[in-house]
A protein has these predicted regions:
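Core structural elements
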Residues: 91-104, 122-134, 152-172, 312-317
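Catalytic cores of enzymes that engage adenine nucleotides and/or redox cofactors via long glycine-rich
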Residues: 21-39
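Short helix-adjacent coil turns
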Residues: 142-149
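Acidic, turn-prone loop/beta-hairpin segments
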Residues: 37, 70, 110-136, 168-252
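Metal-dependent nuclease catalytic cores in nucleic-acid-processing enzymes
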Residues: 6-22, 251-258
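Catalytic adenosine-cofactor/nucleotide-binding cores of aminoacyl-tRNA synthetases and other
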Residues: 35-39, 43-118, 217-221, 260-269, ...
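C-terminal low-complexity, glycine/proline- and small-hydrophobic-enriched intrinsically disordered tails
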Residues: 87, 214-334
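Short alpha-helical scaffolding segments that buttress acidic/His motifs in well-ordered protein cores
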Residues: 6, 14, 29, 64-72, ...
Length: 334
């Protein structure tokens, strides 16, 4: 209920229940935010700031509006609703759909994936551990009626951990000649995606159900997602998952560094690892293919080059960055 009608409905229900039935009508009360316009003003026909939810549903879908309201339903604050917000969460639905298309394109089998194989590939261990951690967070937040935090947990894991990182990292394996690793990636990527649909179903039931039935996850195609039990995943976080975190950290820092210097994110660079510690140097050498692909690196050098370089610090290690010859470092710094 909204706080503005607590006395008119909630309080009276409690009074009537205790007076006539000698018991409270309910144990828990969830007081949600009021939905206002993007400036925080109360919606009014006279002000002309009323947003018709039916128009938003028609334009962006019921799931997009539903997920928007859930994500913004923080305790103690009103929802400042705008069309751009709903549009942003519609893009999230598109991201989910595109992830499904990626699995189809890479010939993933949607049947018989209730169990995952023994994990040998590091990125598979990492995403499975992230899934376990996210599941625990969502369960805790739902139990605490923090629907906004639960929605954000699901959003962050799906968009960033799974789509932005895991699927991108998996491409280096899917395009390799290692058939065993490719098969493991196919099975794990499909298994995790299946669990993502289960996690997201309370928030966006229509699109998740559509994908579930389309892929026939239950082997028959007639068992609805809404009938499935909640998932239980045990974390397997170890040194191998830490290695993946290290890769992500290095690539993220490289991208941020380019952005800070106003350099095109698509530009290629050379980096020198001459000044970093021995363990990190060995780690980078063993993960050179992935780092080059996602970091857009031409060469990873053991020695410094005799030309101007920008310096970047990652976890205490000093990297020297060499840009294309047409990039003027003096102009960048200005």
């Amino acid at each position: 209920t909204g706080f503005d009608i607590i006395f008119f409905w909630v309080a009276r229900m409690i009074m009537f229940g205790t007076e006539f039935l000698n018991k409270e009508p309910f144990k828990d009360i969830y007081v949600h935010a009021l939905v206002r316009d993007e400036k925080g003003q109360k919606m009014s026909k006279s002000k002309g700031n009323v947003i018709d939810p039916l128009d938003l549903i028609e334009k962006y879908s019921a799931d997009a509006l539903r997920f928007t309201l859930l994500s913004m339903a923080s305790p103690g604050t009103d929802v400042k609703l705008s069309e751009d917000r709903v549009k942003g969460y519609r893009n999230f639905l598109n991201k989910l759909w595109n992830a499904n298309n990626f699995l189809i394109t890479n010939e993933c089998d949607f049947k018989n994936i209730d169990q995952i194989p023994e994990l040998k590939v590091n990125i598979n261990k990492w995403i499975y551990s992230e899934l376990a951690e996210t599941t625990n967070k969502i369960v805790k937040n739902l139990e605490d009626y923090r629907f906004d935090e639960a929605a954000k947990n699901a959003y962050q894991f799906t968009w960033h951990s799974y789509c932005d990182w895991y699927l991108e990292l998996s491409k280096t394996i899917l395009f390799s000649d290692d058939e065993d690793a490719k098969e493991e990636v196919r099975r794990v990527s499909t298994y995790v995606f299946k669990q993502i649909l289960v996690l997201l179903h309370p928030f966006i039931p229509f699109v998740t159900e559509e994908i579930w039935l389309k892929n026939k996850f239950d082997n028959k195609g007639n068992d609805y997602l809404m009938q499935k039990n909640w998932i239980s995943v045990k974390s397997i976080k170890d040194s191998h998952t830490d290695q993946v975190e290290n890769i992500i950290n290095i690539i993220s820092e490289l991208r941020s560094f380019k952005n800070e210097l106003n350099v095109s994110p698509g530009s290629f660079i050379d980096i020198s690892i001459n000044n970093i510690n021995k363990d990190q140097k060995q780690f980078i050498s063993s993960n050179e293919i992935i780092l080059k692909k996602l970091g857009r690196i031409n060469n990873i050098l053991s020695d410094d080059l005799d030309k101007p370089a920008a310096t970047m610090v990652v976890s205490g290690d000093l990297f020297k960055i060499y840009f294309d010859k047409d990039v003027d470092l003096k102009l960048i710094k200005e």
